[in-house]
Amino acid sequence: MPEVDYRILILDLLRERGPAKTICPSEVLSDNDKQNPELMEEVRAAARTLASQQRIEITQRGKVVDPAQFKGPIRLRLKR
């Protein structure tokens, strides 16, 4: 099975939604994969990478958070 590049999937989904919208990291995964904590962590790691590259923002309760410091539920959006 080929390795999935979650960075591309995150960016594609965010571009599809538009600049004013956010996504939950779980939306990147298929329904079956959403229950796999290892895959969920891979998506969150991809989000951290994109945020550190200034391509997206990671938010909690509508506020941008440090990609290296967040814990708990997050949302992703294109960099404003």
Residue ranges and their predicted role:
Residues 29-40:
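Short helix-coil junctions and helix-kink-helix linkers
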Residues 38-59:
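Charge-enriched amphipathic alpha-helical scaffolds
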